[in-house]
From Swiss-Prot:
The lineage of its organism: Bacteria, Pseudomonadati, Pseudomonadota, Gammaproteobacteria, Aeromonadales. Disulfide bonds: none annotated. It is an enzyme of class 2 (transferase). It catalyses: adenosine(1618) in 23S rRNA + S-adenosyl-L-methionine = N(6)-methyladenosine(1618) in 23S rRNA + S-adenosyl-L-homocysteine + H(+). Belongs to the methyltransferase superfamily. METTL16/RlmF family. Specifically methylates the adenine in position 1618 of 23S rRNA. InterPro entries: METTL16/RlmF (IPR010286), rRNA_lsu_MeTfrase_F (IPR016909), SAM-dependent_MTases_sf (IPR029063). Its EC number is 2.1.1.181. The keyword Transferase applies. It is found in: Cytoplasm. The gene is rlmF. One of its GO terms (cellular component) is cytoplasm. One of its GO terms (biological process) is rRNA base methylation. This is Ribosomal RNA large subunit methyltransferase F.
Amino acid sequence: MKTHSDRKSGLHPRNRHQAPYDFDALCLRTPELRPLVFVNEHGTQTLDFADPAAVKALNKALLALHYGIAHWDLPAGYLCPPIPGRVDYLHRVADLLAESAGCVPTGKGVRVLDIGVGANCIYPLLGAREYGWRFVGSDIDPVSVKAAALLAKSNGLGGQIECRHQGNAKHVFRGIISPQERFALTLCNPPFHGSLDEASKGSERKLGKTVQGQPVLNFGGQKAELWCEGGEAGFLATMIVQSKEFAAQCLWFSSLVSKKENLPAAKKALAQVGARQVRVIDMAQGNKVSRILAWSFLDEVACGQWWQPALRGGV
């Protein structure tokens, strides 16, 4: 039997999802996926990737088979992320950390902050399994914080993943990073759209269909996950300005940037706040192209010195 044949070109070499999905193995590990798999006109096993239930079942199977994450679920209506692309972000920034650490740093001595952890808790779960990193995940949505914490605990990672509620939606880091904390890295997948209407129209274009005249938001998604005032560009600008306050406490700040036209303004903002190093790291999965924007307020020498206490004491 053939399997889904779209090779995920452009993924990081360490990404476990280079090959087509092995639906037989996935269904064996997660039987609930089997009824959702069908053979298309080309004789290839596949899914309806516009069906949120199918994508959710695929995620559960991928996480269980490849990462030993046996318990994964979502509250109704929350964002269901694509696993190959999410783990690719982690592999790319792991290489960034390796530049100053001398090798890809692993273990609980590497602390990572995930801004907007979401109910899916996907970056902490994958990062803990792939690299053994220790995570703090923050979110302005209390339901997401509770759901993410439950996922961490259910998979035996409660001591490695801490979820914190951000009580002030205007703050990105303040109220989350305490005065004595240090993080090797911050992650963020910022809201893409600037309004609910924009998010709905974008989803309608993507799916090319409506249900009873109402746009279908593919894979779910709550307000904080999908849109914020100013959209991606506005969120990036706020995060960049606010990152300066924590310049000495974080080795690298980073964010996904879906719209490449947002990069020039972001780079200008980084120059204005005095970032010493700025990187744009390209990512690709099939036809989907994105990039990571990363910045540090430390020069290369200071970055190298960072790891001396970090790898000793787990700060």
